[in-house]
C-alpha cells in the first residue's frame, strides 16, 4: 500500500509528510520511505494556531474555523509530497493524519477529565485528495484508560528492533519522548513515555529574545553559559519525578512556562538563558534515563531523532550527561534513517495497522487497559 503520513507537531514549524510504501502489516511489515517533505506554515496560519493553543486567546469560533483551514493545508501538503515524488495522487491508498493538537489532558484534574483534541478536518482531506483518511489516533487509547501518548512506540518496534541490542529511541520534537525497544531475544517489555520539553522551550526563547524561529545547529546556545540557578529552577518541575507512563505538552512547557522563566531571570543575558534551557532539555532526558530506565534495562544504544537531533549543542549536552554510561549514542542519520521524517512515517504505519484492524497502541507505554485499534476512518466521495 502507498500511504501518506501527515504530522503537525507541537513545534509548529510546518506540516511533515512522508510518502511510504508498506508491504503487509504487523511487526513483519516492510517499510520503504519514498519521499519526505515539510510544508512550512505561513506566518498568519502559525499565529492562528498559537492563538488557538492559548486558553487566554482561544475561542470556539477560531478553533472551528481552524479545523477546516488545517484540513485544507494537510490536503495540499499531501498533494505536494506526491508532486515532488512524481507520484500520481490517484494511486495513493491511504492518508494517516495526526492533526494539530489543540489541547491534551492526559489525567483527570477536578472536573476536567482526561481528554485530547486534534484538529485538521479529515473530511476536507478526504474530499480534496479523493483518498481514505485515518485520523484521531489518540482518542481510542484514552477511551481505554490510556494517556493517548506516546503513539510512536509501535512503529519503533517495527523499524528499530534489533536481534541482540537493547535500544533507546529518543525523539526530540516540541516535546521529548523515549521508547525502550528491547532486543528480539529479550523477554522485557517495550516501555515509552514523555521526557519533558524537547525544542518547545528553546524555540519559544529564540522567538522572544532573538526574533528567530529556532536556534540553528545550537549556534547561539553554544555562545552562552549555563546558569545554575535557572537550571535548578527548571529541574524542579514536578513532571520530571512523576513515574511513567506519563505524557506532557504545551500545557506544562509552553508559553506560560517561558513567560514565568523570563520574568524571574530577566537579569541574565539572553545567550545564557538560551544555553540553560537547552541544557534543561538535555538534563531532563538524562534524568529520565537514570531514574526510570537504566536501573531496569541494560541499554546498548541510544538513537536520537526529531528536529532536536540537528541541534549540535543539545546533542553534545546529552552526550556529556551520558558520558559515564556504557551505551553508544547515535542519531537517526548515523544509521541511515531520517530524523525529520520519523513521526510522519509513524502515522503512515499506524494508518496501515488501522486499515488491517490491528491494535497499534502499546499499553505498557500509554497506560491503557488493553490493546486497541486506533483512529477514525473517513472515506472519500464515491
From Swiss-Prot:
InterPro entries: Anhydro_N_Ac-Mur_kinase, ATPase_NBD. Pathway: Amino-sugar metabolism; 1,6-anhydro-N-acetylmuramate degradation; Cell wall biogenesis; peptidoglycan recycling. It is an enzyme of class 2 (transferase). It comes from the Bacteria. GO terms for biological process: 1,6-anhydro-N-acetyl-beta-muramic acid catabolic process; amino sugar metabolic process; peptidoglycan turnover. Its EC number is 2.7.1.170. Keywords: ATP-binding, Carbohydrate metabolism, Kinase, Nucleotide-binding, Transferase. GO terms for molecular function: ATP binding; kinase activity; phosphotransferase activity, alcohol group as acceptor. It holds the Pfam family AnmK. ATP binds at residues 9-16. It catalyses: 1,6-anhydro-N-acetyl-beta-muramate + ATP + H2O = N-acetyl-D-muramate 6-phosphate + ADP + H(+). Catalyzes the specific phosphorylation of 1,6-anhydro-N-acetylmuramic acid (anhMurNAc) with the simultaneous cleavage of the 1,6-anhydro ring, generating MurNAc-6-P. Is required for the utilization of anhMurNAc either imported from the medium or derived from its own cell wall murein, and thus plays a role in cell wall recycling. Belongs to the anhydro-N-acetylmuramic acid kinase family. This is Anhydro-N-acetylmuramic acid kinase. It comes from Bacillus cereus (strain G9842).
